[in-house]
Amino acid sequence: MSHWAPEWKRAEANPRDLGASWDVRGSRGSGWSGPFGHQGPRAAGSREPPLCFKIKNNMVGVVIGYSGSKIKDLQHSTNTKIQIINGESEAKVRIFGNREMKAKAKAAIETLIRKQESYNSESSVDNAASQTPIGRNLGRNDIVGEAEPLSNWDRIRAAVVECEKRKWADLPPVKKNFYIESKATSCMSEMQVINWRKENFNITCDDLKSGEKRLIPKPTCRFKDAFQQYPDLLKSIIRVGIVKPTPIQSQAWPIILQGIDLIVVAQTGTGKTLSYLMPGFIHLDSQPISREQRNGPGMLVLTPTRELALHVEAECSKYSYKGLKSICIYGGRNRNGQIEDISKGVDIIIATPGRLNDLQMNNSVNLRSITYLVIDEADKMLDMEFEPQIRKILLDVRPDRQTVMTSATWPDTVRQLALSYLKDPMIVYVGNLNLVAVNTVKQNIIVTTEKEKRALTQEFVENMSPNDKVIMFVSQKHIADDLSSDFNIQGISAESLHGNSEQSDQERAVEDFKSGNIKILITTDIVSRGLDLNDVTHVYNYDFPRNIDVYVHRVGYIGRTGKTGTSVTLITQRDSKMAGELIKILDRANQSVPEDLVVMAEQYKLNQQKRHRETRSRKPGQRRKEFYFLS
């Protein structure tokens, strides 16, 4: 019986059983599975028969690794599922997935085995005879150290690189550079470019490529400067009625049109969507092969929420460039209907990671033809823990694609994501990469208690003017529903919007808010990203968010494209850990800081220092004293 992982419970072989098998996929299904364990393994391409071959029983541990580490890494890197079933002298290996990934996993396993066999042949026979056999005739207290063979990682890496080359060898080349600088743009002096960027929200650009830096393209201040070679796109822009590009669009377009990967860091409402969509249209229509020959979508836009996905799809439909077809894929809609829509042929897929990953794993969508990738609102993606799904999705997207990433903030986690998925990118950001709330918004901070929140909110609502439109942020769904009910009972028009709301109810609430039928929209952060609301006068933070990035994003709903407005934020003792960060944000935006907030921040700092001293003075192993009072 197998003995490579002693920390798992062993099972005796039963002639009636199919055999013990190692069956791991990510963090689920790990451990032993027999005939009553995992039924019907699933993986990408699981409709295809598994790739089966045999290995010697003494090589099973080499493939599994300590605590299953190697087999888990293999499955993660190849997007496959691997089963190993013990036999009398040989173990049967079954690999589930698509054809390329199965071959890649088999090649990696064979490399591991060759490396181990080479190591064994070089080992001394005397040394081998003197060692206690692992897993045999051991007492309960026996401890045996197993020599870890030297890994020939260069050979493994070379095998993986070769497999990757074979995987993408049949795909046509990608054309990326379509930019021709206009005469007006080329005539801009260096000082004019510097002044333009400073006057337009202090836009900053940088080249993140290592080594010799490239020249940052000059901004295209007019639509015709960016798209003079594409009259059909200019006609669509004129038809929609946009007068001039936003600053972020002016700077992003010449970079993307040159085929350079780009990171855009800017708040919601700065025109990020069109900054990547319009170059994407040109990219799709200008590839060496026709759309019919492409055999799949050419552009993929990943968004964290269905609201943002619907907004992006609406923008695609609005400009309708050369008949490009787009589809929106997200959870909550009919899955079979989405599969049917994809099968009819699409050029652009706008999707949330969860639903797209589901369709990908069941071979319902072909992503090999994607040459233009957008990761929209990357910071929100990470907040919602979508990174594992993103990694799996990108296993099936060609590595020589062009990639654009947008984010409202620039924390270390987003930087790491950018390093993983973008190649030699440039970055364009508004203002400073440190968190800064827009200075066109008057930020009012009220230090209060949980009990006083309702009364303060009621007072605020009663003092609203007829033209005011308020987004009210809360932390929980039931609070949104309770507040909405209370306001409507009083004859105050309000709607709640959260993750449990039906899609039709969400769309109706947003439309009612835009049209002015309701004046107060009460929402949670999870659905707020992607809401296309341009005439908000007030943001009311009933509950303070979990991190300061979200606060900046909330306030940004008012300050879109330089508009002015007011935010009101209630902060209580339970939010005291955020007080110091909030003060920094207020200082950077030249806002007044309430004395109560300063006191809260100082008190929290003192409490933390006291707790730290107590922890350091405590003896090792000594627990903090607990006191219990009996009534």
Swiss-Prot record:
Name the gene.
Answer: DDX53
Q: Which reaction does it catalyse?
A: ATP + H2O = ADP + phosphate + H(+)
Q: Where is this motif: Q motif?
A: 222-250
Q: What's the protein here called?
A: Probable ATP-dependent RNA helicase DDX53
Q: Which Gene3D superfamilies match?
A: K Homology domain, type 1 (3.30.1370.10), P-loop containing nucleotide triphosphate hydrolases (3.40.50.300)
Family designation: Belongs to the DEAD box helicase family.
Among PROSITE patterns, the record links this protein to:
DEAD_ATP_HELICASE, HELICASE_ATP_BIND_1, HELICASE_CTER, KH_TYPE_1, Q_MOTIF
SMART domains referenced in this protein's UniProt entry, alphabetically: DEXDc (SM00487), HELICc (SM00490), KH (SM00322)
Q: Where's the KH domain?
A: 48-109
What species was this sequence derived from? Homo sapiens (Human)
